Structure formats: structure tokens, C-alpha cells
């Protein structure tokens, strides 16, 4: 008997090196059906069928407020690009997509007055529930850098801020192989981190 129904492409488990990364936990939170939907979107945007996408392709992803845009897409690629090729494969993309979903949910949950923006206190809470436990003083400095007048951050600004924090985390963890929270960095490593964040 023939079946004419839609067949989902099987999703293979990610490679072991991917499973050792801090953002693998985002991948593990994705439901099976969501994973197939993400796979379909990924394949539709991967025009050259290379199995990876660039910031130019990723910028078209719509998240709550509209497309990511090239600047945010570039930052997010830097976070999730394990092999530093300037592109992400499907597993990296799926973790990135879930990262954005979690940030968006936490943004909405902390925008208690529904103004469409969040202040430093709300950002601190949203970051904590998103897995970034930073001291409030650091969050306040980041907030004032992103919003010099202190009006609050829209989701697009919050996502860019989180991407910058995640880049710093990824770069730091490259030097903290034992995951102790301590790394030996020289001044050139610091310059690298500053230039990429």
C-alpha cells in the first residue's frame, strides 16, 4: 500500500563535541515536533544546500517583533558557531532558535507593565531566568551602555545584549576547559574578547 502523506526527515542526534557546549541544554529543551519545524525552516533558508547558514541567511528569522537583522544575526552566529567558520549547522541553529525563544519568553514575563521595554531590574531578572547570573552592577552598566538615557530596552536591544554576554561566555569557556569558572587569560585574549563582543 502506498502512502502519500508528508514524511518528516529524521533528525540525527548531535555530535558529541556539540553536547559538551554550554548551549547544548537549549537544544535538549526542544520538543520533537518543534525540531522538525526548525529543520524545515533551516532547509528552506539554506539555499545552497551546504548544510549551514550564514548571518545573511539568518537575518530573515522572525522573532516576536520582526526579522533579526544583520547585526543581531552576526552576533548570534558568533555565539553558536562552534568551528568559527562564520556559519552554523542545523544543531547550532536549533540551539540558537531555542535560546531566542527562551529570551523572548523571559523578556515578556519581566515586562510587567507591558510597555514593550524592560529596565535594569527587569533585565537582571530576565538574564537570571535565562541562565546568565550576573551581578546587578554589571547588568546596570550593560543597561546604561545599551540605553544611555535609561528608557529601557526593546526586545531587539535585549537580544543584542544577551548575544554580547553569550559571546563573552563562549570565548571565556574556550579557555576554561575544566568548567571551573577560572581561566588563564593574557592581555591578547582580553583584546580578542573585546573585539568580538
Swiss-Prot record:
Gene3D superfamilies: EF-hand. Residues 33-67, 68-103, 111-133 form the EF-hand domain. Ca(2+) 3 binds at residues 111, 113, 115, 117, 122. It comes from the Eukaryota. GO terms for cellular component: cytoplasm; membrane; phagocytic vesicle. It is found in: Cytoplasm; Membrane. This is Penta-EF hand domain-containing protein 1.
Amino acid at each position: 500500500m502506498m502512502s502519500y502523506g508528508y514524511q518528516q526527515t529524521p533528525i540525527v542526534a548531535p555530535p558529541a563535541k556539540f553536547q559538551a557546549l554550554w548551549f547544548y541544554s537549549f537544544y535538549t529543551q526542544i520538543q520533537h515536533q518543534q525540531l522538525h519545524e526548525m529543520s524545515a525552516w533551516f532547509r528552506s533558508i539554506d539555499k545552497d544546500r551546504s548544510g549551514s547558514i550564514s548571518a545573511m541567511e539568518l537575518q530573515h528569522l522572525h522573532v516576536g517583533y520582526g526579522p533579526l537583522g544583520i547585526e543581531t544575526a552576526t552576533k548570534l552566529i558568533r555565539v553558536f558557531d562552534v568551528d568559527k567558520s562564520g556559519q552554523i549547522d542545523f544543531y547550532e541553529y536549533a540551539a540558537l532558535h531555542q535560546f531566542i525563544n527562551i529570551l523572548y519568553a523571559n523578556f515578556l514575563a519581566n515586562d510587567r507593565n507591558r510597555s514593550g521595554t524592560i529596565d535594569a531590574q527587569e533585565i537582571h531578572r530576565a538574564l537570571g531566568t535565562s541562565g546568565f547570573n550576573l551581578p546587578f552592577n554589571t547588568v546596570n552598566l550593560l543597561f546604561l551602555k545599551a540605553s544611555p538615557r535609561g528608557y529601557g530596552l526593546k526586545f531587539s536591544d535585549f537580544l543584542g545584549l544577551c548575544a554580547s554576554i553569550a559571546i563573552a561566555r563562549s570565548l571565556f569557556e574556550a579557555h576554561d576547559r575544566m568548567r571551573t569558572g577560572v581561566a588563564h587569560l593574557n592581555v591578547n585574549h582580553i583584546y580578542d574578547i573585546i573585539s568580538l563582543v
